[in-house]
Amino acid sequence: MDSDVENEKMPLLDHLVELRRRLLYSVAGFLVCFFASYYFAADIFNFLLQPLADIWQGDSSRRIIFTAMHEKFFTDIKVAFFAGTFIAFPIIANQIWIFIAPGLYKQEKRAFLPFLVATPFLFFMGGAFVYYFVFPVAWPFFASFEQEGANGAMAIALEPKVNEYLSLVMRLIFAFGLSFELPVVMTLLARARIMTSSSMRKKRRYAILLAFVAAAVLTPPDPLSQIGLALPI
């Protein structure tokens, strides 16, 4: 084996034992983060609700509802799962790195490590973008379709369900988080010589079209959310 590889060649059984150890550490780290997140699930969900609460300030009659006995419980489970996964990602990524690093050349380590660091940071940036810039615009737009009961018309009021609200929020956070990973993907493709800068320029029109198609699929059917996702892509 090349001298740049730090460790000597390991037998297959040793690799399997090491893989099992890293998987156990990853699962243990996730479970700790999951149960900690479940303890704070109500606070996390209230944080996700804040952009909606901001447009209803001063109206104590506003509420979100659940219509099944188990809905709120499983919503808290989902909150804990999403939050636990995000918090545990550095632990899991570190275990992956410990497992694969001994088999990499030094130059491969130097090339790979920045992507491992940039991936969670860019995903967090995407989530922060949708929370602080998209939600404050999209939620008032959706709420504007309410209708007051007057002149014989029925009142139409927005009362979101907790499960549906969480699903929408997490879908948008996931979509924007992935869209912010595009620099990592493009850089990896360029380093692997799958794509070059000239080919990217030639296919720019198709990429723009694909960005808007992806935004239409991943976001609610309103132009504000779709444009908000397509632009970062």
Task: Describe every region a protein language model picked out.
Residues M1-I233:
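Membrane topogenic/interface segments and analogous intrinsically disordered interaction regions
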